[in-house]
């Protein structure tokens, strides 16, 4: 029974990720005054399936001087971690309801660094290694702010359980009370998922394709799926943390619908940002975090610690 539940959980995520690639190409197309994919199937709807068939039927090549085991393990690890992150997310019911759901997600997002580092090192290519080192430095740096923001949210919520956030936000979304945190969280998720304008790891003019430059066929598709699964997972997390879930005990199916709509809107914002903003310089990227975000998140964390003490109150879930 658990295997069936797992398949019913993973297959829709993979389908959503596949069609997100089509949505991205369509959105970017219309924003650049062109149509995007429109040949394969009606309105180009079968394009993701054609891409998947093409990638997974090609011969997976690897450089002669590469480290075989790490080269193969890295994309598998990336996709496994990207899909595992979804397990504690309440939609409105999680596959596994964890007491420490927030810590679990933070730990898994930290582990994804290893797949990037291994792929860059195992490829035995200077471009791949530089891209991997950039990605690792960027991901680790922005995880600091993500962790402090999650700590602040946990202090308001009174629990590490994600499901309790739904109850906390029954009357008011947390984005209203904590909008500076929400803003910094959203920008940090852009950097965490290596998306524009923070896609320094894939600077085409200098690094070709970044850490996955030597990958082709199936392993490359795995990295691609992992990246887009992480994007959707991060936006789902944003929806849970700051936009509640409009809990309605009488019409429970509407909870999932509202959650999906919020996640789709946040994902569309990711695509809009990619079409609108140029790439940051690497020193600007690090300056934004260490000089701007980190002091502000620490100050806000202290603020959220001091409020319950000053008002002699406790968070709602304790």
From Swiss-Prot:
GO molecular-function annotation terms? Answer: NADH dehydrogenase (ubiquinone) activity
What's any one GO cellular component for it?
mitochondrial inner membrane
> Which reaction does this enzyme catalyse, per its entry?
a ubiquinone + NADH + 5 H(+)(in) = a ubiquinol + NAD(+) + 4 H(+)(out)
The answer on whether this UniProt entry bears the keyword Hydrolase reads no
Keywords tagged on the record: Electron transport, Membrane, Mitochondrion, Mitochondrion inner membrane, NAD, Respiratory chain, Translocase, Transmembrane, Transmembrane helix, Transport, Ubiquinone
Look up and give the membrane topology term: Multi-pass membrane protein
Give the superkingdom in one word.
Eukaryota
What are the transmembrane regions? 2-22, 70-90, 100-120, 136-156, 172-192, 223-243, 253-273, 294-314
Q: Name one GO biological process term.
A: mitochondrial respiratory chain complex I assembly
Instruction: Name the enzyme's class.
Output: translocase
- Record EC number: 7.1.1.2
PANTHER family for the chain: NADH DEHYDROGENASE SUBUNIT 1 (PTHR11432), NADH-UBIQUINONE OXIDOREDUCTASE CHAIN 1 (PTHR11432:SF3)
HAMAP family, per the entry: NDH1_NuoH
Q: What does this protein do?
A: Core subunit of the mitochondrial membrane respiratory chain NADH dehydrogenase (Complex I) which catalyzes electron transfer from NADH through the respiratory chain, using ubiquinone as an electron acceptor. Essential for the catalytic activity and assembly of complex I.
Q: What assembly does the database describe for this protein?
A: Core subunit of respiratory chain NADH dehydrogenase (Complex I) which is composed of 45 different subunits.
Give the protein name, as stated in the record. NADH-ubiquinone oxidoreductase chain 1
Report the gene name: MT-ND1
């Amino acid at each position: 029974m658990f295997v069936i539940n797992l398949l019913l959980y993973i297959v829709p995520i993979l389908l959503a990720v596949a069609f997100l690639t089509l949505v991205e190409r369509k959105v970017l197309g219309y924003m650049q005054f062109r149509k995007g994919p429109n040949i394969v199937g009606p309105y180009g709807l079968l394009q993701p399936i054609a891409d998947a068939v093409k990638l997974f039927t090609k011969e997976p090549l690897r450089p002669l001087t590469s480290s075989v085991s790490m080269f193969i393990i890295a994309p598998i690890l990336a996709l496994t971690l990207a899909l595992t992150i979804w397990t504690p997310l309440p939609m409105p019911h999680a596959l596994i309801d964890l007491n420490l759901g927030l810590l679990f997600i933070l730990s898994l997002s930290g582990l994804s660094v290893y797949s990037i580092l291994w792929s860059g090192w195992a490829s035995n290519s200077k471009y791949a290694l530089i891209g991997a080192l950039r990605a690792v430095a960027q991901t680790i740096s922005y995880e600091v702010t993500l962790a402090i923001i999650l700590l602040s949210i946990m202090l308001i919520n009174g629990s590490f359980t994600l499901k309790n956030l739904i109850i906390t936000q029954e009357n008011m979304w947390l984005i209203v009370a904590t909008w500076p945190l929400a803003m910094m969280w959203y920008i940090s998720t852009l950097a965490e998922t290596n998306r524009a304008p923070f896609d320094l790891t894939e600077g085409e003019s200098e690094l070709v394709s970044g850490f996955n430059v030597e990958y082709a066929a199936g392993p490359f598709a795995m990295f691609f799926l992992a990246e887009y699964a992480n994007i959707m997972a991060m936006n789902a997390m944003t929806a849970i943390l700051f936009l509640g879930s409009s809990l309605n005990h009488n019409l429970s199916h509407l909870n999932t619908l509202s959650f999906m709509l919020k996640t789709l809107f946040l994902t569309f914002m990711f695509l809009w940002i990619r079409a609108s903003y140029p790439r940051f310089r690497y020193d600007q990227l690090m300056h934004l975090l260490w000089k701007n975000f980190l002091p502000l998140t620490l100050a806000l964390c202290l603020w959220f610690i001091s409020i319950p003490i000053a008002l002699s109150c406790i968070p709602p879930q304790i």
